[in-house]
């Protein structure tokens, strides 16, 4: 019986010794002054809570197109006509979009120029 009373009194002392947070202490002020991230706002206790219905839009950076591809008007990567192994090896593409030693035909396809090397 004496051990139960001793444990109870020890637990009571621990609870009483624990300091209570004050509104003016430095730690509490630092938490209250920290701004919430987008789509969150502080409640009356200083805790950041999500705003209902708010959607976070992430800034997604478009990766560049691979070799033999270029961006079209819709910002999509489309294959450059006639670009093949030769253009990939030399990485030389003329303004019409065809590889070196190629020219566009009336149908828009790139054709090899005879005798060009």
UniProtKB/Swiss-Prot annotation:
Key word Hydrolase present: no
Tissues expressing the protein: Expressed outside of acontia.
Region (3 X approximate tandem repeats): 29-117
Domain of life per record: Eukaryota
Subcellular location per the Swiss-Prot or TrEMBL entry: Secreted; Nematocyst
Alphabetic keyword roster: Disulfide bond, Nematocyst, Neurotoxin, Repeat, Secreted, Signal, Toxin
Post-translational changes noted in the entry: Contains 6 disulfide bonds.
Principal place of residence: secreted
Keyword Cytoplasm: no
Signal peptide coordinates: 1-23
Sequence repeat locations: 28-56, 57-88, 89-117
Function: Putative neurotoxin.
Protein name (database record): Structural toxin peptide sea anemone type 9a
């Amino acid at each position: 019986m004496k051990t139960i009373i001793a444990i109870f009194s020890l637990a009571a002392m621990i609870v009483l010794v624990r300091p209570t947070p004050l509104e003016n202490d430095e730690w509490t002020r630092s938490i209250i002054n920290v701004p919430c991230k987008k789509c969150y706002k502080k409640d009356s206790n200083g805790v950041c809570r999500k705003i209902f219905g708010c959607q976070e839009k992430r800034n997604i950076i478009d990766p560049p197109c691979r070799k033999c591809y270029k961006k079209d008007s819709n910002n999509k990567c489309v294959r450059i006509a006639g670009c093949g192994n030769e253009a990939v090896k030399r990485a030389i593409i003329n303004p019409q979009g065809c590889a070196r030693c190629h020219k566009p035909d009336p149908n828009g396809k790139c054709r090899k120029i005879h005798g060009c090397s």
